[in-house]
Amino acid sequence: MVYFAQFNLNSDAIAMVTASHNENGWTGVKMGIKKGLTHAPEEMKELKDITLNQKFINGEGNIKKIDDFQNVYKNDLITKNPLNKKIKAVVACGNGTAGIFAPEILRSIGCEVIELDCELDWTFPKYNPNPEDLEMLHAISSAVKENKADIGFGFDGDGDRVGVIDDKGNEIFSDKIGPVSYTHLTLPT
C-alpha cells in the first residue's frame, strides 16, 4: 500500500514500518525515494550513520493525515481490475497484514476466495509468511488441489510480494508471472 500511496499522493519519499525480511520478533523500516525505488544497502548504511551520530539537518516539514486511505487503495484495485470470469482462489497470508485486504479485494473483483491463514497473528504459528518459503508454498499447493481452485496466492508478511500456484498445485515462477502481467496490463481490452 505504501508504494501505491507514493504514486497516488505524489510523494517524494516513503517509509514503511515492516518486518518483511526480518526474523520474527524484529521490525525495521523500509524507506524509499523516487517512485517505486527503495533505498539500497549503501543508502541505508548512510541513514543509519546519520541517525546514530545525530548528523541531522534541521528543516521544516509537515504531516498530513489522510483518513481512510486503506479504502482508497482497495477501491482503486477493485475498480481497475474486474474479472471477466469467476475464479476460485486460495489466498494465503501467513497470518501477516495482507490478510487485512487481500481476501476482500479478491472477493470484490469476482473471485471465490478460500482463505488460508489470513487472521493476523504476529507469532506466525504455521509458517514464515514468505512466498519463497517451501512450507508456505506446499500449504497453498495442498489447499489449491483439495479445493479444486484455479489459482493460489501466497503473500509475504507485509503484502508487497506474492507467490503464485497454478490449478495443478505447481508454483508459477516470477519469470512467467512478469510477462503475463505485462501483457495483461499493456494490451487494450
Question: What is each PLM-predicted segment?
Answer:
Residues 25-34, 101, 160-176:
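Short Gly/Thr/Asp-enriched flexible loops that form oxyanion-binding sites at enzyme active sites
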Residues 1-35:
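Ferredoxin-reductase
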Residues 6-9, 22-24, 80-85, 143-147, ...:
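Solvent-exposed alpha-helices and their adjacent loops that cap or buttress functional pockets
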Residues 27-147:
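Gly/Ser/Thr-enriched, mixed-charge loops and adjacent short helices
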Residues 52, 56, 151-152, 157-169:
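Self-splicing inteins and homing endonuclease
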Residues 183-189:
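Conserved small/polar residues in nucleotide/adenosyl-binding loops
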Residues 115-117, 170-182:
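Gly/Ser/Thr-rich active-site loops/lids in small-molecule metabolic enzymes
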